[in-house]
Structures are given as C-alpha cells and as structure tokens.
A protein has these predicted regions:
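Generic N-terminal amphipathic, Lys/Arg-enriched alpha-helix
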Residues: 22-33, 343, 509-524
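Glycine-rich beta-alpha junction loops
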Residues: 65-66, 168, 252-254, 303, ...
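A charged N-terminal "starter" segment
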Residues: 483-548
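Structural motif
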Residues: 24-26, 57-60, 96, 160-162, ...
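Conserved dinucleotide-binding and phosphotransfer motif residues
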Residues: 54, 157, 299, 365, ...
Length: 548
C-alpha cells in the first residue's frame, strides 16, 4: 500500500505554527530492523517516491543494521579478553548478504571501512585496553556502513539521493565545561532552526541520506548520541530544518500501553501529547529514545510513528494537541538495569545543604540521577546503568564521595515499573485493587512524578515483567476503543502472535512419536538425535574452543 500525504494529519491541525506546517522538509528515521532487508528497502524507496511526488524534501536518517551495534560492542568486549574474529566475520557477512540482496557490490563499497574496523580492534587486542575515543570510532562504523548501502540502493532505483556524513552536519556541545565520558558516549547537540544547514541541504533538490547516532565535537572528534540515539539525531535534524513533521519508522506501528512482546494484549496508543510520550519513553518504552521529544516539542513539530512492514497502520501521533480525556493510566512500562544508591544518616535530618552536597557528588562524577525518594533519615536515588555509563571506577569514586556525608548502601539489578498517564495522583484510590500485586514484593523505592504523569515502583529485576503483565491485565486490557486506545497488538498481528505462542522445539514436532514411545512405560529419558547433532555442529564452529 502506498502512503500518501493524505494519510498524515495536517501539521497545522496538530498545533504546528505556520512556518512548520508550510515547510516542505520531512525527516524520516528508519531503525535497524527497517534497513536490514531488501523488502524493507523496497518499501522505503516507494515511500520516498511518494514524498517527492507530493512536493516534499525528505531527509533520511537511519541506524546500523539490526544487531550490528550490539555486535560491535561484543567485539570490544571480546578483544579485551580473547579473539573477536567470529563476531567480526558475522558483521562482515551480514553486510555482504544485504548488499547481495540489493544487487550491490558489498566488498567494493565496504572493505575500506571493514579494514579500519579490523585495525582498530587489533589495537585493542594488543594493549588489552579500549579508550573512550576508540570505542566511539568503532561503534560509529555500523551507521556509516549501513548508510553507504542504503544510498547506493536508492541511487540504483533512480532516486536522486545524496549521502552525507552526519558528523559534518551535527556538532555536539560540551556539558559541564569539560570532555567527560558522557560527552563522548551520550552527547547532545543544538536543535534550533539553522538557516545555513537548510540552504546547504536544499542544493540540488536531492533526497538527503545520513546517519543517526553520531556527531562531531568542537575538536573534530567523533561522538555518539547514546544507544538508540538515531531517534535523537532525527529530532535534531527536524528542529534544525523546521520540518513539517518527523516520521519514525520502526518494526512496531506506534507506542503501546505495554511492551507488546511481553504483553500481547497491549493496546496501540493513537494520540499522545509530547509530555506523555516523553514520560513513556523515559519510563522504558523502547519505541522512542527519551531525548528525541524535546527538539520536536520546542518547535511544535508533530511526530508520527509508523511500521515499515505494515505502513498502512496509522500508528501513533505525538503533538501538542490531544483530545482531553478523564484521568487515566495510558501505559505500564518497565526499565531494567537500575542501581539504587541508598543514603542513611540521622544527621541529615534538617541539615542545611545535605541534598546539595550529595547531588554535587553525583554531578562531579558525571552520574545522572533518575528517581528520588526522601525521608527524614534516608535519601534513595536510582541510576540507569543500562547504557554502560556507570563504570566500576566511577561507581567506586561516587561511593567514596558519598560516604564522607552519610552511610551508603548499593542495591543492584533492579527494575522500575511505572504507571504513566494523566492526573495519576487523582486516580490512585481507584487503582487500589490493581496495586495489590505489590503486596508480595519488596518495594525498594516509590516515586510520584511532580508533573502528575508517572507513578513508579522499583523492585527486584526478576519480578518486573510479571508485575507489568498483571498490572496491564487489571488496569488497561479491558478498556474499549477510544481516542486514546486503538487495537491490541494481538489483533493487529494475529498470525505473528499465534506463531510466537507455538515454540519451535523438537518435542512439539515429534509429539505423536513421543506419545507412542511413552505408551506402556512409567518414565523415560529421551534425546533427539537431530537436535543434538545440530547443537554439536554449532559448537564445532566456535573457534575459541580448543577441543570437543
């Protein structure tokens, strides 16, 4: 199905000012799953032709191929302790395979970049150490290789495309006055309208294709915008270009009331205010990076989330205009990988400046605080460690500084389960029965957001997913269709859900044989020869195992 301009709500009706609503720029971001197959690229080419036919100027921002960023991180870890050649070969093969599917010459296009990767990894293996600058250079290669393939394919389809290096277009700013690890791995950029950039990208009326995730600092060094930072890159470009809209194309058609891979009954959220989307993203919804909201909200640029595999699904619209509804919970989210820092001390009660001193320690160590809970004798904060920013050295330095002020206790492997919606405070009494699921669990921290959009509970990580499923079933699952809730994931993708519920295991396929074998026997141990052989062959392919 071809998606036309009529399939998108008019930006003016979504609160965009005239300069935005009348803009011809459209920024389209495609995630890793959306750029990893020939079928997806065929869809992208059709979408771009439609945009050009509608008189728009598309800017494409896309990620590394699916799984490549994780593979590059794995290469770094392997290089510190052993031989990463297996993973390097997987990265090479994945790019070559896509090039072949797109009828492109992969080796000619990518071998120079792959040699650079090999050389950087060889250096890491030699010194058994990886600096933040080397880490950044290696992680950036995924986007650079993927966009080379994408631009070449679109050009082969007779589309007027221009490949540009995002590092020549986005300059990061130094936070805190000095270059910290965060300034390299989770950098930020300005996003105010940029007339010079608009003029530069207008030359030739070509489709601009560039990378997400990467930028350059004022010293000319490559920096990253944090894991999942391609969303943020796209939002920066939308802000700088004063784009008519930002389109996020992913493997899901929008934001849902819970992670649909965990809760198949999760409902599509049809329309959200920027504030609600920001809260959902910050609370753990993986569809959007939390930092991508601010640039579009500042300029009142509408944001549309669509699914590359099912572009006909309207998805989620995020803007400053939403239909007012009664107070309600719109999403149940979870964030794993949290660490709690609990600070105790009788002396902190009514002590002037204690919180200032404590938070100064976090600031000086470059550690961002998430949730906060306080009492007369305790302050507990959560830190999101999932992005790898809290190294052992930084954590040790932070604890040393805090122990000069109070007693400190560290609680690792926690999850934050959050209820996100409108006017949460007013509906807490109505949630009493739903919140009974917490009676059996130890709650380390509870926090009600000052903006009244979020109620969060921090629990042990192994309990998180179970609690999300129970809360969603109690609070959201039975809600009818409305201006907020669309269809459930299982209704939108019924065949996918059915296949997911049928595990691909040998004993399901050989059920009848097993039943016959069990007939007349009290018990028996059964091994499947084919499954054992397949597993053995996988082991034999591992180069780091000396003997099997």
């Amino acid at each position: 199905m071809t998606i036309t301009e009529a399939d998108f709500e008019d930006s003016a009706s979504l609160g965009a000012p005239p300069g935005i609503a009348e803009s011809t720029w459209v920024v389209m971001k495609f995630g890793g799953s959306s750029v990893s197959t020939a079928e997806s690229w065929n869809t992208i080419a059709k979408l771009l032709r439609r945009r050009l036919d509608d008189g728009l100027r598309p800017v494409i921002v896309h990620s590394a191929l699916q799984g490549v960023s994780n593979a590059l991180a794995s290469v770094l870890e392997s290089a510190l302790i052993g031989d990463p050649s297996d993973v390097l070969e997987e990265i090479r093969s994945q790019h070559y395979a896509l090039a072949l599917a797109l009828n492109l010459d992969g080796p000619t296009m990518l071998d120079e970049t792959l040699r650079e990767l090999d050389q950087l990894v060889a250096g890491v293996r030699l010194v058994r150490e990886v600096s933040v600058r080397v880490r950044v250079r290696i992680m950036a290669l995924g986007e650079l290789m993927a966009t080379r393939l994408g631009a070449a394919y679109l050009a082969a389809q007779s589309l007027p495309v221009q490949w540009l290096d995002a590092r020549d277009l986005l300059t990061s700013r130094t936070v805190g006055g000095r270059q910290t690890v965060a300034n390299y791995l989770s950098a930020t950029c300005d996003f105010e309208p940029d007339a010079e950039l608009q003029a530069r990208l207008s030359i030739g009326d070509r489709i601009v294709l560039t990378q997400g995730f990467i930028a350059r600092n004022k010293n000319g060094e490559t920096v990253l915008l944090g894991r999942g930072g391609s969303d943020t890159s796209a939002a920066y470009f939308a802000g700088k270009l004063s784009a008519r809209r930002l389109e996020i194309w992913s493997d899901v058609p929008g934001m849902f009331s819970a992670d649909p891979r965990v809760v198949p009954s999760a409902r599509l959220l049809v329309a959200l205010h920027y504030d609600e989307a920001q809260e959902l993203a910050s609370a753990g919804s993986a569809v959007l990076h939390p930092r991508c909201i601010s640039p579009v909200r500042a300029a009142a640029i509408p944001l549309f989330i669509r699914c590359t595999a099912s572009p006909e699904i309207a998805g989620t619209v995020i803007s400053s205009v939403t239909e007012e509804v009664e107070p309600q919970v719109k999403g149940i989210c979870i964030r794993n990988g949290l660490t709690l820092i609990s600070m105790d001390g009788v002396g902190m009660w009514q002590e002037v400046g204690f919180l200032a001193k404590a938070f100064a320690a976090f600031s000086e160590n470059g550690v961002s605080v998430d949730l906060v809970s306080t009492s007369e004798t305790n302050v507990t904060v959560s830190i999101d460690t999932s992005d790898g920013m809290l190294s052992d050295d930084i954590e040790e330095s932070l604890i040393d500084d805090l122990e000069k002020l109070c007693r400190v206790r560290v609680i690792s492997k926690c999850s934050a389960v959050s209820l996100v919606g409108r006017k949460i405070r007013t509906i807490i009494p109505r949630l009493a029965s739903a919140l009974e699921v917490f009676e059996e669990e130890r709650i380390h921290l509870m926090s009600l957001a000052a903006n009244d959009l979020n109620l969060s509970f921090v629990v042990d990580q192994q309990q998180g997913l179970r609690l999300v499923s129970k809360l969603h079933s109690t609070i959201i699952r039975k809600k009818g269709a409305s201006s907020v809730f669309g269809s459930s994931w299982e209704r939108l993708f019924a065949s996918d859900v059915a296949s997911a519920r049928e595990p691909d295991v040998w004993w399901m396929k050989k059920r009848e044989q097993l039943l016959k074998l069990a007939d007349g026997q009290l018990n028996a141990y059964v091994y499947d020869r084919d499954s054992v052989a397949t597993a053995a062959k996988k082991l034999l392919k591992l180069k780091n195992i000396s003997r099997i």
